[in-house]
Structures are given as C-alpha cells and as structure tokens.
Amino acid sequence: MNIDGKYVSEDRNFILTITNSNGSGTFDGTYVSKYTPRGEQTFKVTGRWYYVVNETAPLSLGFTAFVRPDGWPYVIEDAWTGVLSQVGKLYMTGVRSYLPNGGTAVLSSLGTFDFYAQ
C-alpha cells in the first residue's frame, strides 16, 4: 500500500507530506506546524507505519519532528501517533515539547484531529 501524499489537519494548522513510504514500514517527508512558540515551522520527518492483519487500511502510523537551529537557542519537538483509518484519512493525536535556552520547558497537547489527503 502506498501512503504517500499531503495530509492537512481539519483545523488547517498542521500539514504532513509523506514521501518514500515503503513496505518495510517507514516513510520520509515534511511536517508544517502553523503555530509554535517561534512562529510557523517546517520540519523534516522520518516516520513509521504498521499493518494490522493484512496490507490494507486501517494501519497504525506515527512520527516525531524536531527543530533546533544553529547555536541551539531552543528545541521544539512534536510527536504524532494515530491511524490511517481509510485511504486518504488520518486520525492523529499530537504532543509538543518546547525548551528555550535558559528557560522553562513547556509541554503541551496539540490535540486530536482528522487529517485529509489533498
């Protein structure tokens, strides 16, 4: 099954573009968060996905994305997990950690959303 494509959250604040998905259960791609403590960010991602019973939907998938600029002034890490409930639709829940240099860590929920293929 090929899960490559661009998936946009129902609130349009998160975009996952999956490329190079393969039968070994991994994929590459990009992830955009329209809001972070540092404004909109684009992350490179490597994710994983797993079939249950057979090679069709539903399937489990997840990814972690982080950004840490040169000089390491902060790190933002988002993690998402969920299912491809049917072809073209992801049901995902996400969390974030944000750690600024010399600051206090902030942990937050990103929410639970349907993501639709565009």
Please report, for each region that a protein language model flagged, where it lies by residue:
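Central antiparallel beta-sheet cores of small beta-barrel/beta-sandwich binding domains
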Residues: M1-T81, T93, S97-Q118
